[in-house]
Amino acid sequence: MADKVLKEKRRLFVRSVAMGTINGLLDELLETRVLNQEEVEIVRGENATVMDKARALIDSVIRKGPQACQICINHICGDDPHLAGVLELSTGSQSGKCLTVQESQAVVPPFPAPQTVQDNPVKPASSEPRGSLKLCPPDIAQRLWKEKSAEIYPIMGKSIRTRLALIICNTEFENLPRRDGADVDIRDMKILLEDLGYSVDVRENLTASDMAIELKAFAARPEHKSSDSTFLVLMSHGIQAGICGKKYSEEVPDVLEVNTVFQILNTLNCPSLKDKPKVIIIQACRGEKQGVVWIKDSVGPSGNSSLLAAEDFEYDAIKKAHIEKDFIAFCSSTPDNVSWRHPLLGSLFIIKLIKILQEHAWSCGLEEIFRKVRFSFELADGRAQMPTAERVTLTRSFYLFPGH
């Protein structure tokens, strides 16, 4: 019986389900009259954390009986194959019912075969060939989840998630040299992020205040509620204080502080991205050889991390949220060193990052991918720079599962 299945999977459901799936389930259960409007509002409004909402939701459904539980299970199988895999649920190929793996003899894998990224091709701005994103085979995706499900950020099903990414690139400046090749960086990064399932917005040639406005608008997008992650790509000149706006000069301090970027996207200002990976890619020189420099995102390590009480981290007792968590910034070079950019081919860091993501995202977590990017720069070959991951607060491994 479906109610027995949900009772057995209750604890794992509470620990694994994402907010977007909870919202989808609530909408489905309201539409099918399993829950009424008051019950839905209680789940959403009277529970502070995602796990509290999940616990209230599944308990409400179980109390409604087997038919209500079956509707809930069917929705999970249809709209969140990742969660179905974690819970060992799958859709029966003959009956259309969603059964446990143990109950079904003929099942569809919880990770269906990925569609090629060329289903909706994006035409490059030039005739130059580009690489293609290697997709994650269903058996690899299932194995990774089976082995590491407790340590991996959950992904949401394609049919319900609304992933967003933002690229801000300053190419033209009033007082600084033009960043030739930046158009190639924009084109190729946009293609990559779209192939990974993100809807990408591009903003160009902004002042520091305009960049902050765009970031705040991006943080306020309602789509983040039903997303599982986000990417932010910043490409510009820089100085020690941060990222240069288009009007920067020694007399005009048109600078966006990197710390401001983190503040805009933190839990306090962007609660929709709470507990979800927020990846910040920054392409800029960090040394004086090119006349502009910017420093690392963090002035120094936090002095409070060792003072956090152990009970704050218990999965079923968390009532407070860390203001800054689940971030990673990947910078194009170490402090005091330049980042190289070809006027026709684009930035060396962006070129290598895209290539390695295309080749390894199907099997490697993001931090391992970033290590591979650093390794690709190990031999200087006359163009010395070393990309650096900073301000890392990821608590789990972030697998992109391209194609899923």
Swiss-Prot record:
This is Caspase-1. The modification Phosphoserine is found at residue 302. Thiol protease involved in a variety of inflammatory processes by proteolytically cleaving other proteins, such as the precursors of the inflammatory cytokines interleukin-1 beta (IL1B) and interleukin 18 (IL18) as well as the pyroptosis inducer Gasdermin-D (GSDMD), into active mature peptides. SUPFAM superfamilies: Caspase-like, DEATH domain. One of its GO terms (molecular function) is cysteine-type endopeptidase activity. Residues 111-132 are annotated as: Disordered. Residues 1-119, 298-316 form a propeptide. Residues 1-91 form the CARD domain. SMART domains: CARD, CASc. One of its GO terms (cellular component) is AIM2 inflammasome complex. Its EC number is 3.4.22.36. Heterotetramer that consists of two anti-parallel arranged heterodimers, each one formed by a 20 kDa (Caspase-1 subunit p20) and a 10 kDa (Caspase-1 subunit p10) subunit. May be a component of the inflammasome, a protein complex which also includes PYCARD, CARD8 and NLRP2 and whose function would be the activation of pro-inflammatory caspases. Component of the AIM2 PANoptosome complex, a multiprotein complex that drives inflammatory cell death (PANoptosis). Both the p10 and p20 subunits interact with MEFV. Interacts with CARD17P/INCA and CARD18. It comes from Sus scrofa. The keyword Membrane applies. GO terms for biological process: apoptotic process; positive regulation of cytokine production; positive regulation of interleukin-1 beta production; protein autoprocessing; pyroptotic inflammatory response; regulation of apoptotic process; regulation of inflammatory response. The active site is at 237, 285. It is found in: Cytoplasm; Cell membrane. The two subunits are derived from the precursor sequence by an autocatalytic mechanism. Keywords: Apoptosis, Cell membrane, Cytoplasm, Hydrolase, Membrane, Phosphoprotein, Protease, Thiol protease, Ubl conjugation, Zymogen. The lineage of its organism: Eukaryota, Metazoa, Chordata, Craniata, Vertebrata. Belongs to the peptidase C14A family. Coiled coil: none annotated. It catalyses: Strict requirement for an Asp residue at position P1 and has a preferred cleavage sequence of Tyr-Val-Ala-Asp-|-. It is an enzyme of class 3 (hydrolase). CDD domains: CARD_CASP1-like, CASc. The keyword Membrane applies.
